Amino acid sequence: MSGCFPAVGLRCLSRDGRMAAPGAPRFLLTFDFDETIVDENSDDSIVRAAPGQQLPESLRATYREGYYNEYMQRVFKYLGEQGVRPRDLRAVYETIPLSPGMGDLLQFIAKQGSCFEVILISDANTFGVESALRAAGHHSLFRRILSNPSGPDARGLLTLRPFHTHSCSRCPANMCKHKVLSEYLRERARDGVHFERLFYVGDGANDFCPMGLLAGGDVAFPRRGYPMHRLIQEAQKAEPSSFRAHVVPWETAADVRQHLQQVLKMC
């Protein structure tokens, strides 16, 4: 399929009731990265670049809940002090396997032309995410990669910074994905792009917060049995009417692809 408008003159309303512009992307598809696109937590994966492929207990003991980004800043600093360079870390990121079926899913999405606008929101880091996606051949699919800024400093060592500040009590201090997605939607609205539906593919607890932006007709794709899925189930049980989006748990990315294929058939 080369586009979303096989019928001449077919136009649809966006989520806010506006008429969708011809040729504009109809659906926003948002992906998480760790344990969603890739089948590992990339912050754990880079330990393979450390001496002895492990971190000292004194460093691991500095982690505090809600301040994981600050902890990872210390991890990157330690790795740099041990002689680990960005090229060494890139080599690790490039070998992290995709989740089962993810390569096929991303190829399928890429073939849909203007149907989907695809973005990535990740609490990992830009250097790692982009390294992995380029190695897998999928970097160009994503219109925007929204992650904690990282890159070599003047000494040639990899550094990490927080994405932003926010006031959300549920999310880590460095990133609230609800805020990230909300700001992106406002930005695209200013560009004149109004999506008909939102699709969100994730796994972690921090992927639950942006679920508040999803409305009826939108779809949440939580990885089955992971924190995002459990939090959605708890919310549905506590107050069934409060969770408006359709929920499609996935075990492999083929589950996501199958549902998206059904969506396109109904367009």
UniProtKB/Swiss-Prot annotation:
Binding, Mg(2+): 32, 34, 203
Tissue localization of expression: Has a 120-fold higher level of expression in bone compared with a range of soft tissues.
Gene3D superfamilies to which the protein is assigned, alphabetical: HAD superfamily/HAD-like
Record-annotated active site: 32 (nucleophile), 34 (proton donor)
Cofactor: Mg(2+)
GO molecular function, one term: phosphocholine phosphatase activity
Annotated keywords: Hydrolase, Magnesium, Metal-binding, Mineral balance
EC number: 3.1.3.75
GO terms under cellular component: extracellular matrix; extracellular membrane-bounded organelle
Keyword Phosphoprotein carried by entry: no
Catalytic activity: phosphoethanolamine + H2O = ethanolamine + phosphate; phosphocholine + H2O = choline + phosphate
Residues involved in substrate binding: 43, 123
Keyword RNA-binding belongs to the record: no
Result of knocking out the encoding gene: Mice display growth plate abnormalities, spontaneous fractures, bowed long bones, osteomalacia and scoliosis in early life. Primary cultures of tibial growth plate chondrocytes and chondrocyte-derived matrix vesicles (MVs) show reduced mineralizing ability, and plasma samples show reduced levels of Alpl/Tnap and elevated plasma diphosphate (inorganic pyrophosphate; PPi) concentrations. Mice lacking both Phospho1 and Alpl/Tnap show a complete absence of skeletal mineralization, leading to perinatal lethality.
Signal peptide: none
Subcellular location: Extracellular vesicle
Family: Belongs to the HAD-like hydrolase superfamily. PHOSPHO family.
Alphabetized NCBIfam families for the sequence: DKMTPPase-SF, HAD-SF-IB
Name of this chain's protein: Phosphoethanolamine/phosphocholine phosphatase
Organism annotation: Mus musculus (Mouse)
Lineage: Eukaryota, Metazoa, Chordata, Craniata, Vertebrata
Gene, per the UniProt record: Phospho1
